[in-house]
């Protein structure tokens, strides 16, 4: 099987890493791409994946928010993950600008894209 690089955590063929450094959404997406050539801000496709990511974010960040790779800053109405995956799993909590996920229960909230939150990066192994 594929081993994630040092410092990354593996779940069902994907690698994840939480960074304890706040930045805006655009910088966070660029930051993830710099960490690994296939990496983007995290996208969620199942509740199991959500539980895994919460288990990684909460111990580091406690009660806070992480950026997800979901925004509508480029295309009105079209919602897709920044890594190009289609939106097939949803947990909305309102209107979207850029989306954050709570570190405690993965409730999704919209936030101004210029606010600073923590990146969680993900890529397919």
UniProtKB/Swiss-Prot annotation:
A Gene Ontology cellular component where this protein is annotated is:
extracellular region
What Pfam families has UniProt attached to this entry?
Answer: Lectin_C
Per UniProt, subcellular location reads as: Secreted
Enumerate the UniProt keywords alphabetically.
Disulfide bond, Hemostasis impairing toxin, Platelet aggregation activating toxin, Secreted, Toxin
SS bond list:
4-15, 32-121, 98-113
The superkingdom listed in its UniProt entry is: Eukaryota
Q: Spell out the molecular function terms from Gene Ontology.
A: toxin activity
- Which PANTHER family did the record assign? MANNOSE, PHOSPHOLIPASE, LECTIN RECEPTOR RELATED (PTHR22803)
Question: What the protein does?
Answer: Potent platelet activator that aggregates platelets via both GPIbalpha (GP1BA) and GPVI (GP6). Induces a tyrosine phosphorylation profile in platelets that resembles this produced by collagen, involving the time dependent tyrosine phosphorylation of Fc receptor gamma chain (FCGR1A), phospholipase Cgamma2 (PLCG2), and LAT.
Return the protein name.
Snaclec alboaggregin-A subunit beta
Q: Which organism is it from?
A: Trimeresurus albolabris
């Amino acid at each position: 099987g594929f081993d994630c690089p040092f410092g990354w955590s593996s779940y069902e063929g994907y690698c994840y890493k939480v960074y304890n450094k706040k930045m805006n959404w655009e910088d966070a997406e660029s930051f993830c791409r710099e960490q690994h050539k296939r990496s983007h801000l995290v996208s969620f496709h199942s509740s199991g994946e959500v539980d895994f990511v919460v288990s990684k974010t909460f111990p580091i960040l406690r009660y806070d928010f992480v950026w997800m790779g979901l925004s509508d800053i480029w295309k009105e109405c079209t919602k897709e993950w920044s890594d190009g995956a289609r939106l097939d799993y949803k947990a909305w909590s309102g209107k979207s600008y850029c989306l954050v996920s709570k570190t405690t229960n993965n409730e999704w909230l919209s936030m101004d894209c210029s606010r600073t939150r923590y990146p969680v990066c993900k890529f397919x192994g």
